[in-house]
Amino acid sequence: IQALVAKLEARHYEGLKYNDELSKEHWQEYIDALDPRRIYFTQADIDAFKKYQLELDDQAKKGELSAALEIFNLYQERQIERLTSLTQALKPQIDKLDFEKQEYLLLDPSKSPWPESEEAMLERWRLYLKNDVLNLKLAGKEPEAISETLLKRYQNQLKRAEQITSMDVFSIYANT
């Protein structure tokens, strides 16, 4: 990471410096890259991570990634936990969905606040599940095929989450 920062500062056509201002932008882009739908982090998590906004540049210049790894580890833990829970009880969760009830889901997550609690995060997950089921229904899928499709989708996401390596984390961090 030190070499990457040095090259960025030496070769950028605008003479870009990785300073506190850029660190703050990088922090936001990294959080958004990990959790674009805002379904893994709560507002409390984001508030706790804010202590790193002005540290990413300093850490990178020293070759440290501890802040990035701490953020990523919580993301991965929540992702695996949620996808495991979802795949283990998908059919009952689908069966409980009420399509007569009018509900809204902001599809542009940047306009949504971070969930205030675990319950609010789970509610957002429920709305995304309902949206996925509804889209498959509208595409003409039968109920059993919907369950199978979503189970495969979530199992694949879980498998990918469990296979992430430290190089993958570095790549996500360096490319945001």
Q: What are the residue ranges of the model-derived segments?
A:
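Flexible, low-complexity junctional segments that flank or bridge functional domains
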Residues: 1-176
